[in-house]
Amino acid sequence: MNFIRIMAVLALVTVGSQASAQPKSLRDQIIGTWNFVVAEVVAPDGKKSFPFGETPKGIIIFTADGRFAQIHVASDVPKIASNNRLTGTPEEYATIMRRSISVFGSYSVNEEKKTVTFKIVSSTYPNWEGEAQERSIDKLTADEFVNTNHNVAGGRGSASNFYKRAN
């Protein structure tokens, strides 16, 4: 009888350790808060550019229930001279629009294709509202996340976003 109990306990321990040793899904790994490091656009000719500069600010948050929120801002976006967000000049507004983006909605992860698809509810660029945008997951570790849009508007090449997990 004791032998059977011991074997049963060993079987449970073995099954439990095998289950915990299985790698987390991409979806489980992506959940959390990530600090934006840089966005890199690679043109068809191989030339690289950084639309938010080389030291941007930003964040992307993925929730367990499939929601996301993202903001990217260039570190050199000038303040509005009037100190009133409603009375900026056309030039100030144009700079802000070119040097920042905010978007939120829901997301899904395709484990086989290693992609994340953003279903955009709203954005500071209203043309994206209602779109589904797919990104490849190029790197996803405990501390780093890189995704790439391989179809940047206007045929400008690909755009990769680099993130580090927030503490």
Predicted ranges, named:
Residues 1-5:
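Positively charged n-region of N-terminal signal peptides that target proteins for export
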Residues 6-16:
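Bacterial N-terminal signal peptides
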Residues 17-167:
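Lipid interaction determinants
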